Amino acid sequence: MREIVHIQAGQCGNQIGAKFWEVISDEHGVDPTGTYHGDSDLQLERINVYFNEATGRKICPRAMLMDLEPGTMDSVRAGPFGQLFRPDNFVFGQSGAGNNWAKGHYTEGAELIDSVLDVVRKEAEGCDCLQGFQITHSLGGGTGSGMGTLLISKIREKYPDRIMETFSVFPSPKVSDTVVEPYNATLSVHQLVENADEVMCIDNEALYDICFRTLKPTTPTYGDLNHLVSAVISGVTSCLRFPGQLNSDLRKLAVNLIPFPRLHFFMIGFAPLTSRGSQQYRALTVPELTQQMFDAKNMMCASDPRHGRYLTASAMFRGRMSTKEVDEQMLNVQNKNSSYFVEWIPNNIKSSVCDIPPKGLKMSSTFIGNSTAIQEMFKRVAEQFTAMFRRKAFLHWYTGEGMDEMEFTEAESNMNDLVSEYQQYQDATAEEEGEFDDEEEMDV
């Protein structure tokens, strides 16, 4: 089966990951002790995408948890599904990375990385046909960003032909958790551009906005935010885990969404977003889902898709519906909003349909868009980076761990190149490209 090995790094990654395993276990009818209590054979049919059957019929996640300090791990272990994980798969240091990318990537992280890779190797060896890896981490801290990207590059060396998908929490525009976020994020993006296949961009502020607007809790907790993210992670892989009419997997997703190798940073969204209390009162239709899914307010990262154009997009529907209706809606979206889609990639929405909806809903949809508007996010981080780097503020923390200023300069220019690549394709028209083709033919 097409297994996926899940890796969570740092505090943020572990908290999102813990929530994700609650959602997935619930979908497959697995209780916190690792026993199956489901009511349908479909839950078991492909349960081994994310789970492994251990001795004594215990079902265990194919998960690897790592951090440079024990705190978050302890709370995951003490959490509702803490007993589900294999005890050997918790790998942690004692010193912490102290929000310092260099500590995570070069010093503290490098000491721990071999024991992490051992666990990854064991999990990968336990798979029949490994599809790839998914990593949850944040880019603002030290461990998730520094050690997370170190692990990604090591896995890349070892498994070059497997898909590497990350769920990366970017620094938010208005709220900042740490002062050195711009440094950590820029150094991480520098790595992700080269070593990841698909990066789903998330940010806390956008998640807060979604929570306030639609889910209407009085004060959204991180638990609520992480729940939103888990819904998307679950949606992305639902076709692998349940039967469907139009299947998709991580590789199909990459092939359909990435027109140029460096442009693999995606916006994600989910529908229906209704508050927990009012779920049962709303009947949903495919047009409603589509409209909500493409709504700019539903994007889980702080970029407005209306400020750019979609190169490609993917819509994954779950629930009982006709594929004909899905196709009509996708066509409808492209025709009505044609100015928001580049004209030189015709029919640029991939859709897939999985028959089994998530718990508590009749139907749902997950949206993944490759939009040029994502450059707003990179621009914002780059500006903050430049402001500090020009004065060499806080640099001694990084150079003290053995980093070189040159690496900062390279990361900065890589990020700026990425922004201008997005801009170039946003401005490109079908006609221009055509002219170049004619010239080439004439040369022959």
Curated annotation (Swiss-Prot):
Entry-linked SUPFAM superfamilies: Tubulin C-terminal domain-like, Tubulin nucleotide-binding domain-like
Residues that bind Mg(2+): 69
GO cellular component labels: cytoplasm; microtubule
Subcellular location field: Cytoplasm, Cytoskeleton
Composition bias, Acidic residues: 429-444
Stored Pfam families: Tubulin (PF00091), Tubulin_C (PF03953)
Cofactor: Mg(2+)
PROSITE patterns: TUBULIN, TUBULIN_B_AUTOREG
Top-level taxonomic group: Eukaryota
Sequence positions that bind GTP: 11, 69, 138, 142-144, 204, 226
GO biological process per UniProt: microtubule-based process
Swiss-Prot/TrEMBL keywords: Cytoplasm, Cytoskeleton, GTP-binding, Magnesium, Metal-binding, Microtubule, Nucleotide-binding
GO molecular function: GTP binding; GTPase activity; metal ion binding; structural constituent of cytoskeleton
CDD domains xrefs: beta_tubulin
Positions of region (Disordered): 423-444
InterPro entries: Beta-tubulin_BS (IPR013838), Beta_tubulin (IPR002453), Tub_FtsZ_C (IPR008280), Tubulin (IPR000217), Tubulin/FtsZ-like_C (IPR037103), Tubulin/FtsZ_2-layer-sand-dom (IPR018316), Tubulin/FtsZ_GTPase_sf (IPR036525), Tubulin_C (IPR023123)
Subunit structure: Dimer of alpha and beta chains. A typical microtubule is a hollow water-filled tube with an outer diameter of 25 nm and an inner diameter of 15 nM. Alpha-beta heterodimers associate head-to-tail to form protofilaments running lengthwise along the microtubule wall with the beta-tubulin subunit facing the microtubule plus end conferring a structural polarity. Microtubules usually have 13 protofilaments but different protofilament numbers can be found in some organisms and specialized cells.
Family, as annotated: Belongs to the tubulin family.
Biological role: Tubulin is the major constituent of microtubules, a cylinder consisting of laterally associated linear protofilaments composed of alpha- and beta-tubulin heterodimers. Microtubules grow by the addition of GTP-tubulin dimers to the microtubule end, where a stabilizing cap forms. Below the cap, tubulin dimers are in GDP-bound state, owing to GTPase activity of alpha-tubulin.
Name of the protein described by the UniProt record: Tubulin beta chain
